[in-house]
């Protein structure tokens, strides 16, 4: 469950390392974001000479959460960290690589490009 002022890791090579959520645009009553939801965030930590700079406002989709989510078959899945992938206005990822596993719930939200770039889909 991601809410405002949550610090998240960035799981792509766009250049940002950490971002802070300041608005949940698609989520549970626009209060909490889970896997597959879109948030607006500001870059808190970035690599030098990267595509995004510290202080930039970006859109990101949540790909991993520490809070467990229940699947339709009754199983639960949770991850070790809260992570996002930075996207553009069309919903395509800005980076060309994804680091770490992502949840298969992203397929339901039509983030097929993120699924194809990820090394592991759980």
From Swiss-Prot:
Sorted UniProt keywords: Ribonucleoprotein, Ribosomal protein, RNA-binding, rRNA-binding
One BP annotation, GO: translation
A GO CC term assigned to this protein in UniProt: cytosolic large ribosomal subunit
Domain of life of the organism encoding this protein: Bacteria
Annotated InterPro entries: Ribosomal_uL14, Ribosomal_uL14_bac-type, Ribosomal_uL14_CS, Ribosomal_uL14_sf
Gene3D superfamilies reported for this sequence: Ribosomal protein L14 (2.40.150.20)
GO MF term list: large ribosomal subunit rRNA binding; structural constituent of ribosome
CDD domains registered for this protein in UniProt: Ribosomal_uL14 (cd00337)
Pfam families on file: Ribosomal_L14 (PF00238)
Subunit structure: Part of the 50S ribosomal subunit. Forms a cluster with proteins L3 and L19. In the 70S ribosome, L14 and L19 interact and together make contacts with the 16S rRNA in bridges B5 and B8.
Functional note: Binds to 23S rRNA. Forms part of two intersubunit bridges in the 70S ribosome.
Membership in a protein family: Belongs to the universal ribosomal protein uL14 family.
Entry protein name: Large ribosomal subunit protein uL14
Species of the source: Endomicrobium trichonymphae
